[in-house]
């Protein structure tokens, strides 16, 4: 017999999968619209940053942390918040990324009212979209903007990320044309 916690997690995963049938999901469309960026770019970034396979489908996971280069996924926002606060007490904030867009709290923590607000999916998407828009304004190109989103200093890490983003974005466009989720 499933515990209430496992049942809740299964329900959440099902809800995420149902929402992903509309691509990009409405939250991405709204955040992208507000920042005047393509929703497909925002969704591709979230898949690249926090994507996890759920029932054979790749979905962004809102309670994802990256601490000093190691990714962690949590079943609840509360658990992720607790781990985030512990990480910030132990690590330089520049080594901590949080949420759907894996926003770096050392460089962009001021965009949130508190560290745990970075785990709010809607707020994280709004910040991610705003950052992408800023990078696009500087470059005029969404692939270059994605590379700068990952590593503003550029170099080999940004080039690798641009290549990964391009593959993710092209895969999404094929999925959208076929009407199938990623």
Where are these regions (language model features)?
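N-terminal signal peptide c-region/cleavage motif recognized by signal peptidases
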Residues: 15-17
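Gram-negative bacterial Sec-dependent N-terminal signal peptides
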Residues: 10-13
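Bacterial N-terminal signal peptides that target proteins for export
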Residues: 1-8
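Catalytic glycan-binding domains that act on GlcNAc-containing polysaccharides
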Residues: 21-182
């Amino acid at each position: 017999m499933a515990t209430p916690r496992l049942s809740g997690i299964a329900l959440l995963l099902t809800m995420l999968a149902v929402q992903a049938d509309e691509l990009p999901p409405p939250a991405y469309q709204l955040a992208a619209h507000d920042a005047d960026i393509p929703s497909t770019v925002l969704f591709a970034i979230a898949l690249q940053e926090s994507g996890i396979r759920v029932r054979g489908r790749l979905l962004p996971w809102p309670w994802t942390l990256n601490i000093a280069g190691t990714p962690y996924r949590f079943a609840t926002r509360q658990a992720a918040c607790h781990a985030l606060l512990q990480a910030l007490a132990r690590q330089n904030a520049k080594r901590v990324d949080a949420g759907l867009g894996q926003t770096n709290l050392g460089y962009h923590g001021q965009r949130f009212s508190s560290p745990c607000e970075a785990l709010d999916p809607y707020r994280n998407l709004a910040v991610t979209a705003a950052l992408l828009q800023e990078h696009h304004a500087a470059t005029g190109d969404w692939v270059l903007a994605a590379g700068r989103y990952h590593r503003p200093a550029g170099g080999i890490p940004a080039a690798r990320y641009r290549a990964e983003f391009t593959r993710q974005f092209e895969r999404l466009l094929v999925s959208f044309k076929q009407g199938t989720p990623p």
